[in-house]
Curated annotation (Swiss-Prot):
Substrates-to-products reaction catalysed: Exolytic cleavage of the (1->4)-beta-glycosidic linkage between N-acetylmuramic acid (MurNAc) and N-acetylglucosamine (GlcNAc) residues in peptidoglycan, from either the reducing or the non-reducing ends of the peptidoglycan chains, with concomitant formation of a 1,6-anhydrobond in the MurNAc residue
Positions of the catalytic residues: 302
Disordered as annotated region, ranges: 446-478
Protein name listed in UniProt: Membrane-bound lytic murein transglycosylase F
Family membership noted in the UniProt record: In the N-terminal section; belongs to the bacterial solute-binding protein 3 family. In the C-terminal section; belongs to the transglycosylase Slt family.
GO BP: cell wall macromolecule catabolic process; cell wall organization; peptidoglycan catabolic process
Source organism per UniProt: Shewanella sp. (strain ANA-3)
Residue intervals passing through the bilayer: none
Length: 478
């Protein structure tokens, strides 16, 4: 009997000591059927126009979607708080909006690898006193709410308790920069890349104090359940880094805007208003399959749209053609604006067609312009030199490094065609790219204005507020 009771008690105790397994519901990440990318509008982030979509973040998002083998869905927002909220609620998969790495963002989200670097700078307008430090301001600072600029000012306020600023939720960085130029606000803070891009259209912008240096621009991922997507993003980033994609996009969006000439930019904007209307139709007619604005930008670089222009070397006219070139393409009067534009377009098209097929379509124009400037043979010399230096002869970012070497005996004595002023060719192409970007911006602003004027006024009251002037996307932002 005692043994029987002992066995029962022992069995009960063993049963009580067994581990109880509680079945928990695990989070199963959804398989991506499309890549939903939350973003903000901006020339270096995401823009849409009649020529298609563009932007550093957009181009990378396209490649990432291709890497994942899913369709891309860009979801633009106009408010950072709503953008952050959408990521936390799983309404989007990732934020790609030119955002820098900050302590606050590290706490809230997972951060992707660095895409490029920027400085945070204080921005004011031409004619205002140059501030010596953040306490030496003759007016108010206005910044975007929920931005990294608020974090920077908050840290500065700890050392300078009298520092105050205004925050706005209904403006983006471009609008604040325009308000600086239009004397509507005194100061703002912006990323250096934004200032460099926007001063092509707003030449009165000045950047003063550097408040933060070398900040990494990153993508933001959800704080939880994003291990798989993060692993894929890191693998994709490593692949594109090795392929030179990041360097290519950096050069594409920022390589030509670092140089800035205040007087030249103002003169160009005036010429767009006063001179271009006389010749625009000719550029559009004779551009053919070229973008007429690239042809017009080339002509401005050559002659400032002066049909009687002449250089000491004998080139003349709107497109500054040499006598042999004019004869070759059937131009009899280089001083006739239409003949010169027609001839310049034909010559430029010929340069493009002569280039090797290995040069990507997106970069062929820059190679052709360099050929237009110093000759096709010297560009071929530079390509061969690039190859010998283990650089990519089909990438403009690498050719920019090599072309100036054609002025050094150490290098040009090894080439077939010898010495060439390669650094001038680089400057020439960069200038045309800046003029072209400005023409695109002005053209799009004009189209948007015309569209707003043609739209019936009662539609605005039925459908909500009218779009912000300058918004170029047909997508309705959230």
């Amino acid at each position: 009997m005692t043994r029987f009771l002992f066995a029962i008690i022992l069995g009960f105790l063993l049963t009580a000591c067994q581990q109880v397994t509680v079945e928990e519901t695990e989070y199963v990440p959804h398989k991506l059927t499309e890549l939903r990318v939350g973003t903000l509008y901006g020339p270096q982030i995401y823009m849409t126009s009649g020529q298609g979509n563009s932007g550093f973040d957009y181009d990378m998002a396209v490649l990432f979607a291709e890497y994942l083998d899913v369709p891309l869905k860009m979801v633009p927002y106009t408010n950072r708080a709503e953008l952050y909220d959408a990521l936390k609620k799983n309404e989007i998969d990732i934020i790609a909006a030119g955002m820098t790495e900050t302590p606050a963002r590290r706490e809230q989200f997972r951060l992707g690898p660095p895409l490029y670097r920027v400085n945070q700078v204080l921005v004011y307008r031409e004619g205002m006193p140059t501030p010596k430090d953040i306490t030496d301001l003759k007016g108010k600072i206005t910044v975007i709410a929920d931005s990294s600029f608020v974090e920077t000012l908050t840290q500065l306020q700890k050392r300078h308790p009298t520092l105050v600023w205004d925050q706005v939720t209904d403006k983006d960085s471009e609008e604040l920069l325009a308000m600086i130029a239009n004397k509507e606000i005194d100061y703002t803070i912006a990323d250096s890349s934004s200032v460099q891009i926007n001063r092509r259209y707003l030449p009165d912008l000045r950047s003063g104090l550097v408040l933060e240096e070398k900040l990494d621009v990153v993508w933001l991922l959800p704080p939880t359940h994003s291990d798989g997507l993060m692993s894929q993003l890191l693998a994709f980033w490593h692949q594109e880094k090795l392929a030179g994609t990041l360097d290519h996009l950096n050069e594409k969006y920022f390589g030509h805007v670092k140089r800035f000439d205040y007087i030249d930019t103002r003169a160009f904007l005036r010429a767009i208003e006063t001179v271009l209307p006389r010749y625009r139709q000719l550029f559009e007619t004779h551009a053919g399959d070229l973008d007429w604005r690239k042809l017009a930008a080339t002509s401005y670089q050559e002659s400032h749209w002066n049909p009687n222009a002449r250089s000491p070397t004998g080139v003349r006219g709107m497109m500054m053609l040499t006598q042999p070139t004019a004869k070759e393409i059937g131009i009899t009067n280089r001083l006739d604006a239409e003949e010169s534009i027609r001839g310049g377009a034909a010559y430029l098209r010929d340069m493009i067609n002569r280039l090797p097929e290995s040069i990507p379509e997106s970069q062929r124009m820059w190679f052709a312009l360099a050929s237009y400037n110093i000759g096709y043979a010297h560009v071929e010399d530079a390509r061969k030199l690039a190859e010998s230096m283990e650089l990519n002869p089909n990438a403009w970012r690498d050719l920019k490094k090599v072309l100036p070497l054609l002025q050094k005996r150490k290098y040009y004595q090894k080439t077939r065609y010898g010495y060439a002023r390669g650094s001038e060719a680089v400057h020439y192409v960069d200038s045309i790219r800046r003029y072209y970007d400005t023409l695109v911006w002005v053209d799009n602003q004009s189209k948007q204005q015309n569209s707003d004027e043609e739209e019936p006024s009662d539609l605005a009251s039925e459908d909500g507020p009218a779009p912000v002037p300058g918004t170029l996307s047909p997508d309705k932002p959230k």
